[in-house]
Amino acid sequence: MLTGRESLVRLIGRRRRSPLPAALALAVPPSRSLQDDAADAEREAAAGGSSSGGGDAAGAAGWVACPVCGESIRGTDYCVNTHLDICLTRGTKRKLTQSTLLDFSFSRKATDDYALNNLNTSDEAEHMEPTDGNVSSDGAFFSLNNDKVNSKGSANASSPGCLHGSPDISETCDTCLPPNVLLPYTENTANNGVVKKCLSHMPSTDATSSTIGLLSVTDSSNSVVVDTVIVGRRFHENIELQEGASITLLRDPQNAKDPDAIKVLYAGYECEQMLGYLPRELAKVLAPLLDRHYIECEGCVVGVPEQQLDHVPIQLKCQKYTDENETYDDLKHPQFLWENFICAVGNGNLLQPSSTRYQTNFSSMITDVMANHSHLFSDKEKSFLDSFQLLPDDGQRLFVRIYTRKGPWFRMSSISYREISDLGQAAMELKLAGYIDMISCMDDLSNYDLKEVIDVLSVPEMKEILKELQKNNVSCTRRHELLSTLLYLYRNGTCTILPKRILKWTGTCIRTSDVADELLWRVQRLFFLNGDQDLSFFLLVDLGLVRFPVYACTISHRVFQEISDLLQYEEAIQVAQVMDQSLDNSNMEMVTRCIELSENRLSTAPKEENATRAEPPPSFFSRFSASSVYSKILTLGVSVYERDRRYTDAIRVLKRLLSTVASDRKRGYWALRLSVDLEHMNRSNESLSIAEAGVIDPWVRAGSKIALQRRVVRLSKPPRRWKVPSYANAVTTNIKEVNIEGRPLNCETGAKNVFYGYDGELCGVEQLALQYYADEGGGWRGTHSEGGIWMTIFGLLMWDAIFSDVPDVFQTKFQTAPLDLETDEFYRSRKDLIESQLKKIQDGIAEEILISSWELHQGTSCRGVNWDRHSLTDLRAAVVCTGGHRLASLLRHLALDYRSWSSGMPDLLLWRFLDERGGGEAKLVEVKGPRDQLSEQQRAWILVLMDFGFDVEVCKVSPVSKRR
C-alpha cells in the first residue's frame, strides 16, 4: 500500500454520497435538492389527479380502496403503486392500523406504555427482545437476527453535482417538511414551549407509582415484581423450558465480559440447570443488592418462545431483607441501593427491547450533538434534525436501518423488520419529512445515478432485462460485465427505455436523502470525532463486547469554534475521499487534481488559521483542521508521484509541505523523501543541505532522524564537506549480531520466509529464533510481540496518568486514549503525575502496580493494551526481569513522544529467572531473515535501548549451508 493511504482511509471513515468540491467538479448532473423533491411531489399529485382510476378523485384529495387489504389510500398513481407493492409482498390480507402522517400528533409516544402493552400481550411477547447487553448473547445484533435486506449495492457512491454550486443545505431543509413538522426551534422561548408540550404526554416516572413501565410495585417499601426476560439462550439451548417453572438467580462476578452478570437457574434442582442471564442493564442495578445480601429474588417462567433461541419472558419478585436490630445508619446504604434499583427499573430505557435500542442510540447521538455543537448548524438544519425526534417509531427505525447499510438503494420488497409494524407507512412518512428518496416505475431516474439503481438487481434479473431489450447477442455472465453493458446501452442513447425496465424489476426503492446523508455525516463526525467509529460502537457497548474506560470530560474549548472551521474540514475530507476513490479507479487525472487543489488550499491555510482569537484552542486540536487533512493528501500524493517516477512533482509537493506545515511529526518523513528524490535527480548538494537541515529540525525524530543522519554522513564526504558530523560515530555504532541456521521450506525471492523448526514443524523466522534461544541460546523464555507487550505494559502502569482529568483531552465517551497522547502536550500536562509513577517503578514496585491495574481494568479498552495476546504471567515476568531503572527509562521515553516511538521495537522479548528469589534478566532481539535489513526506525530503537542499558541484539537467520 502507498505510504499515507492507510492513514487517509482511516480519516475518511464511511464514504459519503456527497458531490465533488467546486474546484474538482467536472460536468456532472446537478445535485438533487430538497426543492427538487418538493417539485416532484407536486408533479406526482398533479399526475395522480389527472390519471386517477376513480375518475372523480381530484389530485391528492381522491381516496380509493386497496383491493388487497381494503385500506383507504390516496388515489395518486404514486401512492397506489407504493401501497400495492407493500401489500403484495406481505402475501396475506392485513388491515393497516397505524395513523397516517396527517393524523399524527407529533407527541412522543409513551415508551413505557408501549413496552408494557407489548410485554403484557402473550402473542407479541415472543417477538420482543430485551435491551440485551448480556454478557453471553449476541442475539441483539440486529444486523444478524432481525433484518432481511437483500441488496447488492456497492459501497461506492457517485458524486453528482457540486458542493458549492448547489443550493445550500440550510436554504433547502424546510421545503421537504410537512407544515406540522416544522416547529419553531430557533428561538429559546418557542423551543421551551415545544419541550413542555412533548413532556406533557410522557408518563410519570415517580418510583412510588403503582405502574412504572415494566415495573409492578406490590409494596414500595419491601418488594417489587419485575417483568423481564432471559437472554443468552444460545449457550444453554439444551435445557428444556417449562412455562410456570420456578427460577432463581445466581451472581457470576468472575464473568470476563461483565462483572455484574447474573445467571438464571431452575429452582429446586439438585444440579444447576442454567437457562441464561438477566439483561445487562437490569443486572447492573441488581448485582450490588445481591452481593450484599440486601434482597432475595425468586420468579417463574411466564412463557415459552416459539423460536428456540429467542429471549424467554420471566417474572421476578424482589424482596428486601428486614432486620429489626439494624440502626438507621446501617440501613442508609442498602436503602440507597434499593431506591436506585427502583428508579432504574422504572426508567423505560432499562427494559427497552433490544431490537429498538439502535433507535434510542441514534436519537441520543443527535441530541448530544445538538446540545454541544448547535453553533455549527443553521436554524433550518437544526429544525430538520429535530424533526427526526417527532417522527413515529416505525419511521425512525426504518431510517436508522437503511442509514447504517451500505446501499445506497434498497428494494421495499426486500426489507423486513419485525419491529416495524407498517413498512409502507414508515417509508412515506420519511419521504414527506425529507429523510429518504423513493423511486418507483413512474419516476424519472435522470436525477439519480443509474449505476446505483442497477446495483440492486441480481445477475438473473440483469440477464432478463437484456433479453427484453432483445440484446441476446450479449454473452457476458459476470455481474460487473452485465452492469457495464447496461450502462453502455443507456449512455450511448440506444436504449432510452432502460430506466423504466430497471424500475419494473426493482419495484419501489428507497435510500437516504442527500440532505439527511450530509447532515447526519456531520452529526456522526462531531459525536465520534474520527472516521474509525460509527453507530456500531453503541451496539458493542450494549452487548458488553467493548468497555470504555472511566474518565472525566472537562471541556473548555470547542473542537470547531466556528462553522467556517467545520466546513473547511468537511471539504478537505471530501477531497480526501475523491482522492481515495480515484486511486481505486486508477483515475490519475483526478488524483493529480486533488493533489494540486490540496497544495493551493494548504498555501492559504496559515493565513486563515493564525487569525487572532481570544482563546486559541489546544495544539492537539490541529488534527481537526483542514490543513492537517490536506497535508495527509499531499503525503499520499508524494507516494503516487514517486511510484510513477515523477520526481520533479514530488519535490515540489515536499517543498510545499516543509514550507507551510511547521509543526508536524511527518516533517522527518518529508525531509527524508525530499533528500532522496533530489539525489534521484542528481542534485546531491541540495540533497545534502536538506538532510542537514532535517537533522537539526526539532520535529524530526526517531527513525527519520537516524536516516537523515546516515545520509549526511554518506553524502558529506570531501570535497562536499571536510568536517565530520558529531553524530557520525553514533549512527555507525556496531550492533551485536547472532547468526543461526535453519532449513527453509522455500528460497523464492519475495516469498515469506518459512523454516522447519527444532520440533520439525513449519514456522517463521521469529518462532525459529524463539526455539533457538530456549535451547541452544541459553534457556530463555519469551514472546514474539514486537512492541505490543511494551505498549500493554505502558498502558497498565500509566493508566491513571493516561486517563487523568486534563482539560479538553476527552471530548466523547467512546475514547480509548486522550486526544493529546501522541503529542508533546501529553507529558507536559501530566509531568508530576508521570514522574511520580516512574519513581515508584524505579523503586521496584512495578509488579504490584501492574497486578492492581490488571485486576481493576481487565477488559477495558485502552490504546495499545492487548488483553488477549499477553497474559498477566508474561507481563509480570517481563516487568520483574527488565528491572525498575531500565523500565522507568523506557516508559518515560514513550510518555515523552508516544507517536514517534510506538512502533519499530525489537521482535522478541526474552527473559529468564536467575534464582528462586525472583531475580532475572531480559533480552530484546530483532530477528532478520535472509535478505532482510534493519529499518531506520528499528535501528533508532536499538540504539535507544542500548543507551538505557538493555541487552539488545540482532538475530540473523540464514539457510543451512549447502556444503553440509
Curated annotation (Swiss-Prot):
Catalytic function, reaction form: Hydrolytically removes 5'-nucleotides successively from the 3'-hydroxy termini of 3'-hydroxy-terminated oligonucleotides
UniProt-listed Gene3D superfamilies: 3.30.70.2330, 3.40.1350.10, Classic Zinc Finger
Zinc finger (UBZ4-type): 63-92
GO BP annotations listed: homologous chromosome pairing at meiosis; interstrand cross-link repair
Cofactor binding annotation: Binds 2 magnesium or manganese ions per subunit.
Function, in words: Nuclease required for the repair of DNA interstrand cross-links (ICL). Acts as a 5'-3' exonuclease that anchors at a cut end of DNA and cleaves DNA successively at every third nucleotide, allowing to excise an ICL from one strand through flanking incisions.
Name of the protein in question: Fanconi-associated nuclease 1 homolog
Organism taxonomic ancestry: Eukaryota, Viridiplantae, Streptophyta, Embryophyta, Tracheophyta
